[in-house]
Amino acid sequence: MITSIQGTLVSATPLQAIVEVAGFGYEVHIPVTTAERLPAAGAAVKLHTLVIYREDSQTLYGFASPAERDFFRLMIEHVTGVGPKMALSIMSRLALPSLESAIRMGDVASLAKCPGIGKKTAERLVVELRTKVGATGAAPGLATQPAAAASPGASAHRDAVAALVALGYRSADADEAVRRASLALGEAATTESLIKKALS
């Protein structure tokens, strides 16, 4: 099993990173919370990974810390109805400490705010994970150097909308949420800040 990948960051979006190792470029699916901590393109990077094997595909998921990777695995293995896409959506909305706290406290309302997560799924997260949270540890920062800011303007708006659609939003709803976020944050807002504001 591939438990980590270390190489050069070729490019990144809020939900995906391309890491080059020994001449090979690996596509790694990541949550927004990991994307925020990536270094600039061209820098060395290490992601803690989990490979999901399907009959017709192999998908690599990466995280800033082993704790985040382990929690992702915990969700997809122990919570009924939660697959990789939904788990990534949850971890994009809530950082690990907040996620663990919500589960421990039975905060169904906060969990249900995650895109694509209804009240019943939020309740299952609490019931099935409450006794398991807290064992995954802290989530330290990942970047080996300061992250490069995403380009402001139309490109950031477009990338933020695409990320929300990938998280389960309808296209029109995603565009409206990003538009409101842009009005609140200003024209210089980065893709990551637009996504966080739209999800809040």
Curated annotation (Swiss-Prot):
What Pfam families does the entry give? HHH_5, RuvA_C, RuvA_N
Instruction: Quote the subunit structure annotation.
Output: Homotetramer. Forms an RuvA(8)-RuvB(12)-Holliday junction (HJ) complex. HJ DNA is sandwiched between 2 RuvA tetramers; dsDNA enters through RuvA and exits via RuvB. An RuvB hexamer assembles on each DNA strand where it exits the tetramer. Each RuvB hexamer is contacted by two RuvA subunits (via domain III) on 2 adjacent RuvB subunits; this complex drives branch migration. In the full resolvosome a probable DNA-RuvA(4)-RuvB(12)-RuvC(2) complex forms which resolves the HJ.
Which family is this protein grouped under?
A: Belongs to the RuvA family.
Supply the HAMAP family for this chain: DNA_HJ_migration_RuvA (MF_00031)
Supply the gene name: ruvA
The protein in question is named Holliday junction branch migration complex subunit RuvA
Q: Where's it found, cell-wise?
A: Cytoplasm
**Does the keyword section mention Cytoplasm?**
yes
According to the UniProt record, one GO cellular component term is: Holliday junction helicase complex
Q: Which GO terms describe its biological process?
A: DNA recombination; DNA repair
Listed A to Z, the keywords are: Cytoplasm, DNA damage, DNA recombination, DNA repair, DNA-binding
Native source organism of the sequence: Opitutus terrae (strain DSM 11246 / JCM 15787 / PB90-1)
- Entries under Gene3D superfamilies matching the protein: 5' to 3' exonuclease, C-terminal subdomain, DNA helicase RuvA subunit, C-terminal domain, Nucleic acid-binding proteins
Region feature (Flexible linker): 145-151
Q: What is known of its domains?
A: Has three domains with a flexible linker between the domains II and III and assumes an 'L' shape. Domain III is highly mobile and contacts RuvB.
Give the span(s) annotated as Domain II. 65-144
Which residue intervals make up region (Domain III)?
A: 152-200
Q: One GO molecular function term?
A: four-way junction helicase activity
Primary residence: cytoplasm
Q: Report residue spans for region: Domain I.
A: 1-64
